Amino acid sequence: MNVKNQIILALDVEEKNKAYEILDQTTEYLDTIKIGYPITLALGPSIITSIKEEYDVKIIADFKVADIDATNEKIVKTTLNYGADAIIVHGFTGEDSVLACKNMAEKLDKEIFLLTEMSHPGADKFLKPVSLDIAQMGVDLGIKNYVAPATKIDRLKKIREVVGKDSFIISPGVGFQGGNAKDTLQYSNAAIVGRSIYNASNPKKALEEIIESIKV
């Protein structure tokens, strides 16, 4: 997956008007949007289709799929059929659950991103001890796309070492959570930014400043 300007917008708002206002200001510089539960639960999964049709962007559904294999397969199928280009899945559920997601996505000519470790402090207790194992499982299963934290550069570096230089990593946590876009992109292919853009008084300017900071 190619990502324009190496920035993915995490559109974690709940109102359609606000979402469209932000997209109106930012899609000149962005071509990839991450949509999660806040907007999907508020407006229904058809919002994926609407945004896809209105703005012609790539959409990553951040649903952190984490169930048994049969249920995962249904979640992935339904989500991708609404128009998402990819879906994020948890790795801690194990090989069978992850493989169900991968196989369904491939059947629909779409992609999955395997979540190795999360960006918030609480992830250190349970996910951190197994994140490299999750990454290695992904490699063994032939997965090419991963999620790894921008807030923990040392962990991001280690995950990159496991998955290899040809894998595609996207990293949440840039901005409000403390991650730095330029530092993140030493090891990641794209930085995910949410509140620093959608909560800004001028989202377009905020995005421009982030893009400029990468180039410096």
UniProtKB/Swiss-Prot annotation:
The keyword Lyase applies. Catalyzes the decarboxylation of orotidine 5'-monophosphate (OMP) to uridine 5'-monophosphate (UMP). The keyword Lyase applies. Belongs to the OMP decarboxylase family. Type 1 subfamily. The active site is at K64. This is Orotidine 5'-phosphate decarboxylase. It catalyses: orotidine 5'-phosphate + H(+) = UMP + CO2. Substrate binds at residues 12, 34, 62-71, 119, 172-182, 194-195. It comes from Methanosphaera stadtmanae (strain ATCC 43021 / DSM 3091 / JCM 11832 / MCB-3). Pathway: Pyrimidine metabolism; UMP biosynthesis via de novo pathway; UMP from orotate: step 2/2. One of its GO terms (biological process) is 'de novo' UMP biosynthetic process.
